[in-house]
């Protein structure tokens, strides 16, 4: 597979849900709850704003987020991404719906229970770093631990492990103003990890960084995830970033999920023209994997790993007799075959799909 994109094991999507969101609505305004039925009956976001002065933030969100996986939520500006992630720890209260974590109802929690939930079950990384300017790197990273009740000295000592994990060893006594933007975001990530919360919420965490630094932060996150196995909800507007780090992706538009699935499903089976337009500029040869275009049966051709990119597979298929290869899993077992024609066909998008409202 081409360097830079993550190998997605289809089996990962079978993990039990850590977090469940059901029939979630958010309407901003003094009487938001009174317009739920109107939204269910089809009133548009623009009509709700023009005629009633209320803003539709989320529209019937249903999403199961698997344990220990990275769930990407993406969409254009104003699609509801940040609104959705802030419902998980109730920084925003919903107008209607259900949110459960480990089958515990988040919306029924008392203020005391919610405070404990935020301290111990979730941690958050923001786009704007949100570091305390008067505290050192070590003190910033230790901050969440002190909130949990750790003595400051003990918390600071524990912080060194996480500072080292994000590559900032030696910068413990520096202040945020003495760090670059990328280094500051590493501190933010270390602070979130230090609390050992099982759920990590990342709201456009890398969006403000330069491309090279952004890629570096993605690498750090993926390397840490191999060991930590967090349940991560990752917000982005960047498709390349979503494809690179996500086990699953949900794409929002006007507060509604238009499509959800693993990266291969999103690319190979876009739900409508809106999604098709969203993915039109990706390099399909680098992103689509052989397993997405393989067929039943066997072949005497050279074996190709199921996660091999089409770009790499085409070079081999073109030189094989009958232009076909066998496909093997990560244990070397044959699981199907792939042909040159199938690989070439997958490089081209379908020209006409189900029309979204934007294209009607």
Which role fits each region the language model picked out?
Residues 300-331, 338-360:
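The conserved cystathionine-beta-synthase
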Residues 194-198:
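A short, proline-enriched helix->beta-strand linker immediately N-terminal to the Walker B motif
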Residues 260-261, 269, 337:
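ABC ATPase "signature
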Residues 38-47, 104-105, 146, 153-170:
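Conserved ABC ATPase "signature" region
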Residues 135-142:
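Short coil-to-helix segment of the ABC ATPase nucleotide-binding domain corresponding to the Q-loop/switch region
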Residues 175-179, 183:
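Conserved ABC ATPase signature
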């Amino acid at each position: 597979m081409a360097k830079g994109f993550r190998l997605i094991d289809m089996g990962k999507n079978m993990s039990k849900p850590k977090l469940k969101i059901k029939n979630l609505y958010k309407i901003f305004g003094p009487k938001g709850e009174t317009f739920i039925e109107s939204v269910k009956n089809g009133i548009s976001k623009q009509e709700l704003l023009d005629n009633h002065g209320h803003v539709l933030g989320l529209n019937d969100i249903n999403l199961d987020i698997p344990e220990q996986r990275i769930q990407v939520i993406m969409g254009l500006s104003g699609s509801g991404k940040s609104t959705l992630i802030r419902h998980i720890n109730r920084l925003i209260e919903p107008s209607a719906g259900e949110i459960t974590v480990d089958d515990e109802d988040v919306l029924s929690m008392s203020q005391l229970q919610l405070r404990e939930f935020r301290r111990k079950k979730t941690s958050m990384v923001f786009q704007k770093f949100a570091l305390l300017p008067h505290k050192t790197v070590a003190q910033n990273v230790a901050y969440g631990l002190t909130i949990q009740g750790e003595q400051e000295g003990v918390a600071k000592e524990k912080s060194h492990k996480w500072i080292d994990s994000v590559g900032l060893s030696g910068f413990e006594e520096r202040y945020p103003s003495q760090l670059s933007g990328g280094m500051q975001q590493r501190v933010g990530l270390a602070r979130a990890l230090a609390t050992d919360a099982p759920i990590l919420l990342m709201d456009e965490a890398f969006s403000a960084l330069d491309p090279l630094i952004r890629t570096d932060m993605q690498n750090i996150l993926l390397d840490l995830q191999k060991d930590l196995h967090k349940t991560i909800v990752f917000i982005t507007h960047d498709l390349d970033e979503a494809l690179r780090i996500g086990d699953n992706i949900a794409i929002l538009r006007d507060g509604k999920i238009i499509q959800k699935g693993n990266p291969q499903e999103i690319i190979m089976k876009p739900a409508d023209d809106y999604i098709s337009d969203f993915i039109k500029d990706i390099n399909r040869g680098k992103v689509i994997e052989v397993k997405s275009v393989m067929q039943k049966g066997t072949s005497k051709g050279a074996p190709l790993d199921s996660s091999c990119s089409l770009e790499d597979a085409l070079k081999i298929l073109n030189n094989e007799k009958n232009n076909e290869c066998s496909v093997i899993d990560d244990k070397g077992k044959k699981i199907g075959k792939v042909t040159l024609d199938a690989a070439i066909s997958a490089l081209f998008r379908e020209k006409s799909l189900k029309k979204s409202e934007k294209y009607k």
